Curated annotation (Swiss-Prot):
Zn(2+) 2 binds at D121, E156, H374. HAMAP family: DapE. Its EC number is 3.5.1.18. The keyword Ribonucleoprotein does not apply. GO terms for biological process: diaminopimelate biosynthetic process; L-arginine biosynthetic process; lysine biosynthetic process via diaminopimelate. Its cofactor is Zn(2+); Co(2+). This is Succinyl-diaminopimelate desuccinylase. It catalyses: N-succinyl-(2S,6S)-2,6-diaminopimelate + H2O = (2S,6S)-2,6-diaminopimelate + succinate. One of its GO terms (molecular function) is cobalt ion binding. CDD domains: M20_DapE_proteobac. Belongs to the peptidase M20A family. DapE subfamily. Zn(2+) 1 binds at H88, D121, E184. Catalyzes the hydrolysis of N-succinyl-L,L-diaminopimelic acid (SDAP), forming succinate and LL-2,6-diaminopimelate (DAP), an intermediate involved in the bacterial biosynthesis of lysine and meso-diaminopimelic acid, an essential component of bacterial cell walls.
Amino acid sequence: MHTSDPSNTATDHQQQTLELSIELMRRDSVTPHDKGCQEVLVERLSPLGFVHEFMYFGDEQASGRDAQVKNLWARRGNQDPVVCFAGHTDVVPTGNPDNWRIAPFDAKVHDGYLWGRGAADMKTGIAAFTVATERFVKNHPDHNGSIAMLITSDEEGPSINGTVKVIEVLEARNEKITYCLVGEPSSTDSLGDVIKNGRRGSLGGILTVTGKQGHVAYPHLAVNPIHALLPALAEFSVTEWDKGNDFFPATSMQISNINGGTGANNVIPETVEVVFNFRFSTETTEEELRAKTHEILDKHFANTEATYEIDWKLSGHPFLTAEGKLVDACKVAIKDITGTDTQLSTSGGTSDGRFIAPTGAQVVELGVRNATIHQVDERVEIDDIGKLAQIYERMLEELLLG
């Protein structure tokens, strides 16, 4: 039921969300750095009764994959259901700032848009949920259940010391999330037209084929790994892995890199390397993809002196949140605020939802339009950020009242 105070106008939501968005966006929090964004959120959440803890994972002295990551877990209440907003304060690099119409960390309003890195992905989403929570708690201080925020600064990077580690801590102490709203920019043509109720899995591999180096004029004295690879690669690239289902397209395999050769035109190389990636549906498991890949390669390498090995990396399993209370809350809120009948989708890349869904939580991604994410001149419509805060507030009403 809709119980918001009539004074909760779109203008109020918009101004408050805009101000907080700008405060967050002016901090150049390129992965894995948070640059104080999480402290800003704590300052807003603590007066509402949130209890917070910062969780640090990784090496404080390291950089790259092993760098220390700061994470925030903040919660109000200790009862079920737990409605959690999951997001990230880190952003991707800007590239050459001279190519931007407005400097990427100036966070300025122009032509009806808020411009800057993190505008769409995803500091406005964090700001919108914070404002929605402030208004919801003010109007309903004795609401059912709990509200939580899980914020990391390691979503755009390796994603090894961020959400996945926080979830491990929560699981170890049996602290469960019931409904998880991931604030990734899910919308396509208009706010709320698409929500993600699942994501494909991602399985990558580096295939290295080893032969014997030699002179191209004496191939009988060498083993050409490229020649050994080609027949296997031909079959590998056209294999149908599954047909998909009602929620997911068919599993796809794409080759992104092939590296071989010494640079000389008269040398048979010793090795060739192929980088590939599966985006897979719930119709196929990681184990099945690995087994079928090895079956293809074993068949083709059986009659050659070349050998192969694969270095596998699983980035995430596929997940799907069927229609239920969380999806219904999204649909109702979007319809009430925008008049749009939203569409469910599992397209796109991976998100941190892949770490949360295996705990049993219902997970949905809902945020602003994604047309300019990771691009020069990233921006978001000013009108949308206020409406997003309204949508989030309506969802809290649907999930935690009555």
